[in-house]
């Protein structure tokens, strides 16, 4: 360990004598050093060091991401701009090494913290013991210090806590940057525009007006007290009526089969725990909603087994990304060969991120397959009222008169997407299985919805005339207009895209901009969009088997879309210029 420390220090010293430290760190580094000396003398211990270390790592990571992206844009290696970018990256690496060595030598060793000292290899990869971690790891949204960072976190967190910490930061780093620096036409014109998170911002005026009408303002004592953990009876009764109507159920749905929690992610994670044991698996067609990946690991500790769908199927009459029973059988067979215990099938309808809507016959085939293999079916229908293409018909699983296995079929819906109310945390499960409904009730203790929210939602869902005659027609019209605006630009740029006439997004093919077409290059392009303060979702995060796909959300105000697409076009134009 001492050899690594001396080598790192000598490299840092040499770098400082030959070059200047990047201007961003002229103040930051000395200040951190002085603070560390002062705090160390007061015996503040490891917690302070950890805090400063992680903060410093965050700054370093952002610099690495920007410079790696810039380096990839460079023309041949001998070019002056490319050389300067490479030098800046090395300076950053030396600075990180110097900081790590300082912390280790002055504080950490006194606490007998037995973790190998990280150092930097010649390519600025991080070495932890015998393991080398590239500054850009495939499939991750940021570089990671892997075992070293996990060891730092685990000094105060459990192993599970350290895993949650890492998983969260991998998943939400871009989102946190957006929350801290949002675009505003006047106040912050250079801020982030988020076309990554699927939110419907086209009808906020309609929803706000409806939620502030006088009938929404009742407040009684019952709303201020604990309620049935499944949800208030009046809300569950209204939800049963609402789903019967809009899902076209053949018979009235039972309020006792309704469970209300604070969001569809809570419903999915809780349902997975009820249906699966840790280590069990669920089949899911991919690309799929990436939130399921995060939720499945956070609580239930289950595995999602991808049923890969391809954009092009050679020598076949299948459509792009088409799910078939044969693909389900293949995925199930391969999982069993690996001794996986598959307990269910997750289907998203309308599909996210594709925007596809399953036909009634296809849906029936999937349900029969599940019954044959004794699998639960979890149907996520959160976009069921966001089908904006008139020629497309949505068929809810609750509309099927003779379900192959009602006891094993469970449907999830919420107001986040269809009503643009993602900030009002609400999700609903409808299941014909009384035992499942009873078990799910327990999760209301931790994931319940406030009484005031339940009352307002009940009043909103009761107003079917306003929903059917005012809200839905305007919402569909605005979605269609935004979709047309985005897809015209994509067509002009000759960018292929995919959407089945529903949802809040398009699935775009940027393979032509990746050379070579790899997930590494996909991540580089993803970072270049972020450098331009534009957030898109990369296909890798949706477990897509093919690199080059991105999800672009269009349910945004026209002004935001204009600025966002200007940035989008600029990034691609710059990329093309450097390719030449």
Curated annotation (Swiss-Prot):
InterPro entries: Aminotransferase_I/II_large, Ethylene_sulfur-biosynth, PyrdxlP-dep_Trfase, PyrdxlP-dep_Trfase_major, PyrdxlP-dep_Trfase_small. Coiled coil: none annotated. Keywords: Pyridoxal phosphate. It comes from the Eukaryota. Residues 1-43 are annotated as: Disordered. GO terms for biological process: biosynthetic process. The modification N6-(pyridoxal phosphate)lysine is found at residue 417. Belongs to the class-I pyridoxal-phosphate-dependent aminotransferase family. This is Probable inactive 1-aminocyclopropane-1-carboxylate synthase-like protein 2. The gene is Accsl.
